[in-house]
Amino acid sequence: MFRLFHNQQKAKTKLKVLLIFQLSVIFSLTAAICLQFSDDTSAAFHDIETFDVSLQTCKDFQHTDKNCHYDKRWDQSDLHISDQTDTKGTVCSPFALFAVLENTGEKLKKSKWKWELHKLENARKPLKDGNVIEKGFVSNQIGDSLYKIETKKKMKPGIYAFKVYKPAGYPANGSTFEWSEPMRLAKCDEKPTVPKKETKSDVKKENETTQKDIPEKTMKEETSQEAVTKEKETQSDQKESGEEDEKSNEADQ
């Protein structure tokens, strides 16, 4: 019985030693693995290469390609209506209309800015297309950055507006044209001037003036007749005197 108990105690001691050995091996392996991963991570973290990269940013990246280039069809001119015919108040037709456009972009070279003059049904905004009365392209430069469009003929009564179309390649964001302000021309009828009625006093003054003028006219005529008669008599006397002188000269000879 004592021997059996002693053997059991021995077996338990061996199991404890084996368990401790296994745990120490597992702990050592775990520590070694963690240390290896820690060294690799630290080396990888500190082993960093630096690169200097310059990035080019476009001012207008929404309307340019990857190289910051605009559409080649557009010369980067940028025209907007800055002035027009002032029709505030009453402007009588017929009347010629104009608009001035200012270029806030690059120089206008090849882009075609088209314009139309519309006769509108009303001036409510947004303006709607009406009958196209005249059209053309912006070309008349009147200043460093100013261009003028105008009608060739005078317009009849109605509501008018210029419509300027943006050229091909222009970054329009959906808006491909610009309207001027509506211009209203009125129909003005000229009233004939009514002659002033003469009063009795005006008639009396006119008659008195006429009567005064008659004697003066008669006196002038009589004076002129007397002068003519005297001139004729003088000429006659001179003629007779001349004839007598000739006769006396002949007698002396």
Swiss-Prot record:
Q: Where is this region: Important for TasA fiber formation?
A: 50-57
Signal peptide as annotated in the record: 1-32
InterPro entries assigned to the protein according to its UniProt record, in alphabetical order: Signal_pept_SipW-depend-type, TasA
Basic and acidic residues composition-biased segments: 190-241
The answer on whether this UniProt entry bears the keyword Secreted reads: yes
Q: Per the annotation, which location comes first and is thus the protein's main one?
A: secreted
Name the UniProt key words of this record, in alphabetical order: Cell wall, Secreted, Signal
Q: What does this protein do?
A: Required for biofilm formation. Required for the proper anchoring and polymerization of TasA amyloid fibers at the cell surface. Is also a minor component of TasA fibers.
Q: Could you identify this protein by its name? A: TasA anchoring/assembly protein
The protein's organism comes out as Bacillus subtilis (strain 168)
